[in-house]
């Protein structure tokens, strides 16, 4: 009972936080590797915490990207196949899978538009940007690279690497499914 009470109190405290505060609290307590502080500093220098998650499909509002990242984190924690990777890896993958969207969307008179200054693909761009500041394990890199699943341009172009990545690493499918569940929940909440 005491453990449940403490967990309830922690959840209440977490609910009082902004999404940015919650993201930073999770990141700072879970990610303990060289470069993590520099990565967080870089994120703060971008629009990551104010950016939308998309132009119109889900989270198309200021702060939608960080809200989506937290939703993916929450979903990934429910996936028993992912738990074996540990808290640090789950936080890295879920919280950072869409860092490619930092400084990516811009507001205009019609809403949000895309201005991609580094057009290298979605998942691979996130891996690249993270590794400019902090190293990733092979499993983390695979999961982030392929988190779009069959929606990834390389897969749609005929690449077989997605299937190989999923066979080698359960985290690839776990992150993809967490991302899809979070997106669907967001779309329902937003009436899309």
Write out the residue ranges for each language-model feature.
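Metal-dependent phosphohydrolase cores
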Residues: 2, 6-192
């Amino acid at each position: 009972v005491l453990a449940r009470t403490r967990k309830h109190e922690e959840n209440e405290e977490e609910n009082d936080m902004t999404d940015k505060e919650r993201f930073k609290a999770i990141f700072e307590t879970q990610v303990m590797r060289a470069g993590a502080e520099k990565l967080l500093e870089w994120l703060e220098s971008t629009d990551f915490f104010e950016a939308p998650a998309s132009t119109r499909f889900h989270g198309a509002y200021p702060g939608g990207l960080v809200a989506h990242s937290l939703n993916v984190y929450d979903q990934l924690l429910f996936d028993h196949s992912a738990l074996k990777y540990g808290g640090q890896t789950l936080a890295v993958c879920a919280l950072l899978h869409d860092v490619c969207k930092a400084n990516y969307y811009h507001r205009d008179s019609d809403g949000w538009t895309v201005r991609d200054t580094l057009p290298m693909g979605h998942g691979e761009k996130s891996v690249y940007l993270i590794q400019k500041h902090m190293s990733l394990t092979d499993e983390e890199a695979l999961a982030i690279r392929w988190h779009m699943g069959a929606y990834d341009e390389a897969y749609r172009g005929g690449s077989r690497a997605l299937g190989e990545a999923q066979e080698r690493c359960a985290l690839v499918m776990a992150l993809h499914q967490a991302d899809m569940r979070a997106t669907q929940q967001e779309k329902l909440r937003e009436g899309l």
